[in-house]
Amino acid sequence: GSAGSGGSDGSGDASGTGQSVESSTEISGKVIDGYISGATVFLDLNFNGVKDVNEPSTVSVAEGDFNFGLTATELECASYVPLVVDVPVGAVDAEFGEVTEAYQMILPPMFEPISSSDILNISPITSLVWNTIETLSPTPIIELSCEAVIADQTKREATARLLENAIRDVVVHYNISEEKLFTDFIAEENTAVK
């Protein structure tokens, strides 16, 4: 009997921790120029391009792989905010070796739900799409935030339209098919070549 009561005390403690018990969904993807390890990937909740304290982040490993757990709120935000990669000096590009100059790559928000089965590829091509969104946007993107986009359907639709237009521009300008914009082009190239 006493073991049983001990067990219930234990579970009482667990629920007492509050936040950490909130279930999380793991999302994953790849950082690609060549595959880059040692880069910091974060969910840019306030669109400022800087990893803030409250923003979920992780570091990419071999083959550019990254994954992190998101709370339900963060997961919802992931559909509406960019995923940013800070590639620092000293990160390793599987194709070109050690990175000597820091740079950033960005995956624009897709405006559709993200699930743990999605692979989010962040590359110079996805960054082009994001840069195009910034260029096309009538107001500075920096004025957006996850809360603002979720709360404001007009803002959401306007930004989703910007994404569509940016994709179209990049497709036309660089002669890349739309489905190739967000893929792992290294893996595809390798299968195509070999």
For each of these PLM feature ranges, what is it?
Residues 1-194:
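Feature for extracytoplasmic/surface-facing segments of secreted or surface-associated proteins
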